[in-house]
């Protein structure tokens, strides 16, 4: 995984600190929360619209154990889902 993608994936405490800093700078932080198991055009559209509503887009990914979309889900484990989402240019942090 590229370093710039790794840098977007933060622990919860690190994410809270980033939000605090951005808010102090007067930036509007927006969040999208979901499974993000399969990145399809609807997800891209949703994230684009979310990014347009603020300065910083944070995406939080539901943990594998908490996914309730059926017995075969998630298709991809949470580490891969995090990597996929953080690879998107409109996402600032995961």
Labelled PLM ranges:
Residues 1-94:
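Nucleotidyltransferase catalytic core that binds NTPs
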